[in-house]
């Protein structure tokens, strides 16, 4: 009994004592994080040996450079050798490390600008080298020019067997305009067909570069490549920048990650950027919290800071989800510093100059095609997209590209990476309509081109885009090339010999002629020795009209095209003869016509199946014979008037095939 009373007394006193809460009690919840840390800041990690070495390098020992070359002159292979020499990647077995896309490896071209950071010890001091591997083709000129803006110098690479080509010339002038220090490099000197002396002579005559300063290498075998890195350190100037000034960051390129959103490739001109910083775009006005910063070494390697002079990557948290927000050439700065800095020069929106329509072969595949196109658009903000519908081919898309190679690469990626079965219409270019009320309209879809009555009553002028084309080729093909350019409505601007046997020819050409397999015809005229580059040359007044394909007087909407008046009849004849091959015979006569407005320029007729109505008739019954034939003729007229021509989907696919 006494024990029970003591227990009750102890419990009562315990209840009356002040409570002391444990750290895990509900009134005082445990917090496993410090609330004073910004929500986007990275957890502090031990500083790596790589980051320690980079932090010890001052900006005067930074070198940002790129490789300027024609397509297939060995840019990506030379990049591999430089990465191996600096220990960034292991030697042996590397092939085009900076070419990430399947289509880049398959075609041997660079489509997306890539970068890699290298550490190089020269005379006992560490140097931080940033190599930017740029596209060589004119279609990707926006990426090329922004890549050049992030560099202080360039290796001007020329194939020893092919010599200076059109894109070498075009990219040289882009690099020269950016003020880059150019180092001449002759590649592929190990080939039996190599002629380095001729290549050096061309570089001296065309670019006024000293042949004695050139480095002769073989990127494939590694011959003399080790001489390039000391040349880069000695000849290419260090970037200019101040890490104490407000942040000025140039967007060089971007790509999309499923987990991180849009990742930006950037060059820091002033200031520095860290994870947790609040930055904004001067072009769009949008603001973001930085989630991570780092360098490409050669993959994404996180760093605590990117400072003035460096080239690296950043992504945001929350993520940037729309690639259209990442505009190449845009300037970023910290929020609050927008009025303290000037935007970096050269920003311009990419303009689509080649348009195609894409339709699924099977109409039920439209959702898959839409999803595939949207996924590819995440990595390419320069493509324009618009849904459209055709009575002949069903639902599809009208896509705008920078050029024909850009279009071809996108089509290859759509088929290879997403397994899309598609019908692509021939490429078209935009046209400008100037109305009588002063309004100007850009037409990118032939279906929206004004009809004949509207052209006469309401339109003042029609214009089409022209380009200045630069062609390089051996002198023996000069006559053929001039003939080709003249037949494509070209106007000669200049002709010069930059060696005894090589010619640079400049022509102004309509862009519509250029996208109509002009390069293929040029290669055929010169046995593959010619190269081509071009730049926009503005709009010109032109006599253009809409050519339509009619089947039994009904327009086929998917096949209409805007052409020059001088070519309407020739193209119309080609259309009707080709379309006739793919249309099945019907029970009635099928008339295929090509028309410009009300004017028929070409015609083909598909004869109907013939039923022998005289089979059971007595040979001598002439009156009955005539009566049956007249009746059959009348029946066919009625059938033709009310019957619809059945055109198989595969007929359009075959007709539109290249």
Curated annotation (Swiss-Prot):
GO terms for biological process: positive regulation of translation; translation. Residues 1-40 form a transit peptide. PROSITE patterns: G_TR_1, G_TR_2. Keywords: GTP-binding, Hydrolase, Membrane, Mitochondrion, Mitochondrion inner membrane, Nucleotide-binding, Protein biosynthesis, Transit peptide. GTP binds at residues 69-76, 133-137, 187-190. Belongs to the TRAFAC class translation factor GTPase superfamily. Classic translation factor GTPase family. LepA subfamily. This is Translation factor GUF1, mitochondrial. It comes from Paracoccidioides lutzii (strain ATCC MYA-826 / Pb01) (Paracoccidioides brasiliensis).
